[in-house]
A protein has these predicted regions:
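Canonical Radical SAM [4Fe-4S] cluster-binding loop centered on the CxxxCxxC motif
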Residues: 16-55
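Conserved beta-strand segments that form the floor/walls of ligand-binding pockets within enzyme
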Residues: 22, 26, 74, 163, ...
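A short acidic, helix-capping loop that chelates divalent metal ions and anchors anionic groups
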Residues: 43-48, 132-139, 199-205
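A detector for short, charged/polar N-terminal pre-domain segments
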Residues: 9-15
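Residue-level signature of catalytic and energy-coupling elements of molecular machines
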Residues: 27, 191, 274
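Radical SAM/AdoMet-radical enzyme domain recognition
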Residues: 52-75, 82-194
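Class I S-adenosyl-L-methionine
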Residues: 177-181, 197-200, 205-206
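Accessory C-terminal segments flanking Radical SAM cores
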Residues: 200-275
Length: 275
């Protein structure tokens, strides 16, 4: 990484010429779910609480990165909203004058609607891998499906842009691709299909991978090709964007296994312990 100036503005540029202006901050390793593809059944060894960044440290680091040209900050976890001082962190980061957003499992967002609005958060990514209540319980090892959907409706009704992240696993939820697409018919939400990635302890198996090509092929079985529109990708976007003609919402595919996107990466990732 190196600092360069362009029109007297600082920016962070790596050895490959990529400018990094998007900061992802994990504010906790804790989560109130136990998703099978994310966490082994026996759990994981968490970093000691004394090593986790304080709210002051998070805000101080974020301010430094904003001064170095960062334009967008995303809060992640674990589940960011289980952190006890999450509200304070959100409020303080909302004063930095950059785009602020979050990836969450959605279970606690009802407690933060007004905080989100005050901090300028207008969109959230919600993790939801199935539309089947029993499958949800199976994959998350928790029974919160109805509560999650109540919160998704709450976000939509409060005019937040909702993007639903769906990790596809062959033989488990790939049969629901069209069901997810149909969610976009009348509601302006975005479904983001994510290829199942290797992760330490998640029992990754290549045979469980549903590829970008297979996802589109499945959609083609129900919609004529001319009705599946390829829409514009944003610069440095990790997703390939599409929508069904005349549908209110859209869908995209993050093909991180079959089409790695590191060449245009603009992200800086900060772990909960500041690394």
């Amino acid at each position: 990484m190196a600092l360069t100036t362009e029109n007297k503005m600082l920016k962070i540029e790596d050895l490959h010429g990529r400018v990094h202006d998007y900061l992802r901050i994990s504010i906790t390793e804790n989560c109130n779910l136990r998703c099978t593809y994310c966490m082994p059944a026996e759990g994981i060894n968490l970093t000691p609480k004394s090593h986790i960044m304080t709210a002051d440290e998070i805000v101080s680091i974020a301010k430094t990165f904003v001064a170095l040209g960062v334009k967008k900050i995303r809060l992640t976890g674990g589940e960011p909203l289980v952190r006890k001082d999450a509200r304070t962190i959100i409020e303080r980061l909302g004063n930095l004058g950059v785009e602020l957003t979050m990836t969450t499992n959605g279970l606690l967002v009802h407690e933060y609607i007004e905080t989100f609005k005050a901090a300028g958060i207008t969109s959230l990514n919600i993790s939801l891998d199935t539309l089947n209540k029993e499958k949800y319980k199976q994959i998350t090892r928790r029974d919160h499906y109805d509560a999650l959907w109540k919160n998704i409706h709450l976000l939509v009704n409060n005019n937040f842009k909702v993007r639903i992240n769906v990790v596809l696993i062959k033989g488990f939820n790939d049969c629901e691709i069209l069901d997810f697409i149909n969610l976009t018919k009348d509601v302006n939400i975005q479904i983001r299909f994510i290829e199942f990635m290797p992760f330490n302890g998640n029992q990754w198996d290549k045979s469980k991978l549903v590829t970008y090509a297979e996802i589109l092929e499945k959609i083609h079985t129900h919609f004529p090709l001319e009705n599946i529109l390829r829409t514009e990708d944003k610069p440095n976007d990790t997703a390939k964007n599409h929508k069904i003609k005349f549908y209110a919402g859209s869908f995209s595919v993050i093909s991180s296994v079959t089409n790695p996107f590191c060449g245009t990466c603009n992200r800086i990732r900060l772990t909960a312990d500041g690394k």
